[in-house]
């Protein structure tokens, strides 16, 4: 029986209830490999994310202040903060790139982390055994590697068989990681207070983790430009 005050239910043999108009929702653009967020109606960062990231960065700032000392002593290492932000952003970009090329699995993520660690180790050993070029040369090579990664589209790699695709993706992803660690190793050799330098670098890494959410607006490919700008700021 209908609720009190509600319209009576249709009866067998009575008039047929029908909609006179058809409802159609807004037409949304499909998600792409560069912007793989099908449930995000508009390119934006939700306010809840902004509040969460702000709280994390504030907490990180306080902890680093307690561990690293006064902020005035950190000014001479501001370039290390830019390096930390750029490197974490680069690592995040590589994880997403491999997920798009090979699938989002624990094995693929493990390969990325192993590749990053191997690139870091090779850079450390290279810096220890070989006399590195001047910083402008290293920074120039790093920017070139980022530009190459920008110019090669994902579609070009997806058309390759699995093994060549993996080798090409590894070269594009880990060459900047290797060069970035050569830059870091060369700079860190000149620091006078390693604890403060690491604190500044860690704070920069936290900022880089927050900057990853820019991909909700710009897509992941633009992160390469952000990485290049951060390393440019570290150089100057």
List the model feature ranges, each with a label.
Residues 1-236:
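Alpha-helical transmembrane segments of multi-pass membrane proteins
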